[in-house]
């Protein structure tokens, strides 16, 4: 419907553009109404006094609650969310306890950014209420709202020189640089802390010419890293902007290490010929993640005079003609709207992994399972488009390099990764088929370049299947995949990554996969029938002929990964794509300024990280750490450009 915007303070002629849809976090109107109804129902219950326990599945663990009742009241709750994502679900116990005790019901608003964990807490409390009352208690779970209300009332305004939307890899770097340069900056984060973004938990960035590399005599030159990434892109990215990003590597390291967050250097996992990927290992070798990684940077930012606000979901730009002069954000806890006025706005909201509609729009109606947080729902992209921006051409996904997943699994999110030994066959280089039972790729791409090339190929079919005979099953379980293929010296990934890998839990895990319907065991014909793989038997026959000949005439996979599949017993495992993040966003110039359809910069609007569609290739760069490295460095580059523009305004 027609959007109306009411402002508590005069907007001085400044207008706000039309509201675009968003995936709001927990706490919708429907949820609030249900909470009121449930509270009335709960008030009518009587309980058998005592303490009751229950569990419910969270995003990474079983959430456990212990609820103590008197005859007519919930007296106390102990909530254990320690196994949930640090900085997100693991931090909500006290808030959920407060909400439930105050309302005396399980149907309360959840915590923004931790919807799945919130729902698990409520479900477990409902179980305890049912036990104590002898009455079945149902819970109103939070759902993702699709739209903001037609009428937005701006209840307050804040002023700054710059507003950075998103405390992820790009946002935190930009905020640090801006405030250090004396630019009064407000940093907004949709989640409940600085430790919820992918940038705060991802393994490590690919960077060039850093002190960390120099200390190990392993310096990667800007030229080497740039040529790798720009060459891979075939010129489809903004080369000038990418070069600026690649050149900013040491500044990323400085921002971390000078503020007490140690960094190290990873091995060359995929045979790139250089060691660009860093890590965040502390001096004891433990990888630092979440708030432990980002809080020292936020502390520096605020010590310099910056303002950091959480639970702020940006929903629309503030326009003055064609210029962006601010952003309106929703306080997701209090359900109010705040207008942030600024001379420069940076959008760095982390992509669209939490927006299934957008994933389907670009990749078809297939299941793509996010392993990352799902707060990033494409809202940043929408804001730029509303301000007059346009999309760039490269849309891609950063796929799971640790194996396959399937939606029939009980686990969700990051806990899906390596939770079952059968998932590993997806990247072992053996026979893979599509839903017709046909080969559809050179399986070595998925083994050697799973983040980019192999992952891209899996998107073409939606579901893909590993075909394993009894010999492969047993040898991979007991000896490892490297031994199964005869320890080929030419297989770099195998000889460096799989030398010690066995599958000790494969029997138990295969039984689970079969029970849940994403794997089958039997004759080849039985396996084909179970998944409707009509061409499977002929495909295996053709594949075996290629193995016997020592030459793959279809996809030319290296002969050392060709081994016949024989015998009476087979296993077929069904996989679906899973992702760490998304690529594809708005077009910018080489100064990270959003551009309009005439290719002219939109004054006051900048874009960094994966929201910037001009610095990421499709498929994703083949060197590991490129996504995170480019996100961090693009925040610095955007800040440099913002500072220059503000000085010259």
Spans of model-derived segments:
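Glycine-rich loop(s) and the adjacent beta-strand/alpha-helix scaffold that form part
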Residues: 340-408, 628, 637
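Active-site- and interface-proximal helix/loop "cap" or "latch" segments in soluble metabolic
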Residues: 44-142
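A glycine-rich dinucleotide-binding beta-alpha-beta segment and adjacent secondary-structure elements
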Residues: 78, 316, 534-619
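N-terminal secretory signal peptides and thylakoid transit peptides that target proteins
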Residues: 1-13, 17-21
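Core beta-strand elements of the Rossmann-like FAD/NAD(P) dinucleotide-binding domain
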Residues: 158-160, 335-344
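Beta1/beta-strand and adjacent pyrophosphate-binding region of the FAD-binding site
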Residues: 152-168
């Amino acid at each position: 419907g027609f959007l109306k915007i009411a402002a508590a303070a005069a907007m001085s002629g400044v207008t706000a553009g039309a509201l675009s849809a968003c995936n709001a976090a927990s706490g919708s109107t429907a949820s609030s109404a249900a909470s009121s109804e449930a509270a009335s129902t709960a008030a009518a219950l009587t309980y058998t006094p005592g303490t009751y326990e229950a569990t419910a599945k969270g995003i990474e663990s079983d959430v456990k609650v212990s609820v103590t009742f008197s005859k007519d009241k919930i007296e106390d709750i102990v909530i254990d969310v320690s196994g949930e994502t640090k900085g997100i679900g693991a931090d909500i116990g006290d808030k959920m306890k407060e909400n439930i005790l105050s309302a005396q019901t399980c149907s309360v608003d959840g915590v923004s950014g931790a919807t799945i964990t919130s729902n698990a807490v409520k479900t477990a409390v409902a179980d305890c209420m049912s036990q104590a009352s002898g009455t079945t208690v149902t819970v109103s779970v939070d759902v993702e709202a699709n739209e903001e209300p037609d009428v937005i009332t701006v209840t307050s305004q804040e002023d700054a020189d710059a507003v950075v939307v998103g405390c992820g890899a790009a946002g935190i770097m930009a905020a640090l640089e801006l405030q250090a340069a004396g630019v009064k900056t407000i940093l907004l984060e949709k989640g409940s802390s600085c430790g919820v973004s992918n940038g705060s938990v991802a393994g490590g960035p690919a960077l060039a010419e850093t002190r960390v590399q120099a200390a190990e005599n392993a310096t990667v030159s800007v030229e080497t890293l740039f040529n790798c990434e720009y060459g891979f892109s075939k010129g489809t990215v903004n080369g000038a902007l990418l070069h600026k990003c690649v050149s900013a590597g040491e500044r990323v390291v400085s921002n971390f290490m000078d503020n007490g967050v140690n960094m190290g250097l990873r091995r060359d996992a995929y045979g790139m010929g250089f060691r660009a990927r860093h890590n965040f290992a502390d001096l004891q070798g433990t990888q630092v993640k979440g708030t432990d990684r980002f809080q020292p940077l936020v502390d520096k930012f605020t010590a310099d005079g910056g303002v950091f606000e959480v639970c702020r979901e940006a929903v629309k730009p503030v326009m003055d003609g064609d210029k962006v002069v601010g952003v309106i954000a929703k306080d997701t806890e209090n359900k109010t709207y705040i207008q942030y006025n600024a001379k420069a706005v940076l959008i760095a909201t982390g992509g669209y992994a939490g927006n299934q509609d957008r994933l389907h729009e670009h990749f078809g109606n297939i299941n793509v399972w996010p392993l990352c947080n799902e707060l990033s729902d494409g809202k940043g992209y929408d804001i730029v488009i509303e301000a007059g921006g346009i999309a760039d051409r490269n849309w891609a996904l950063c796929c799971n390099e640790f194996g396959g997943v399937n939606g029939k699994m009980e686990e969700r999110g990051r806990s899906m990764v390596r939770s079952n030994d059968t998932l590993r066959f997806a990247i072992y280089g053996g026979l893979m088929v599509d839903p017709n039972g046909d080969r559809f790729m050179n399986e070595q791409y998925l083994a050697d370049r799973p983040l980019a090339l192999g992952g891209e190929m899996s998107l073409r079919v939606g579901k893909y299947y590993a075909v394993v005979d009894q010999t492969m099953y047993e040898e991979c379980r007991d000896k490892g995949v490297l031994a199964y293929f005869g320890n080929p010296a030419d297989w770099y990934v195998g000889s460096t990554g799989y030398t010690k890998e066995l599958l000790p839990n494969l029997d138990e895990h295969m039984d689970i996969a079969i029970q849940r319907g994403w794997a089958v065991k039997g004759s080849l014909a039985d396996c084909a029938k179970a998944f409707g793989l009509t061409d499977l038997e002929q495909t295996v026959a053709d594949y075996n002929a290629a193995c016997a000949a020592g030459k793959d005439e279809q996809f030319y996979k290296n002969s050392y990964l060709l081994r016949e599949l024989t015998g009476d017993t087979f296993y077929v495992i069904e996989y679906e794509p899973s992702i760490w993040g998304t690529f594809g966003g708005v077009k910018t110039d080489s100064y990270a300024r959003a551009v309009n359809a005439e290719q002219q910069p939109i004054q006051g609007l900048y874009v960094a990280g994966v929201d910037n569609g001009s610095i990421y290739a499709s498929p994703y760069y083949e060197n590991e750490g490129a996504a995170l490295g480019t996100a961090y460095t693009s925040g610095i580059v955007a800040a440099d450009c913002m500072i220059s523009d503000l000085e010259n305004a």
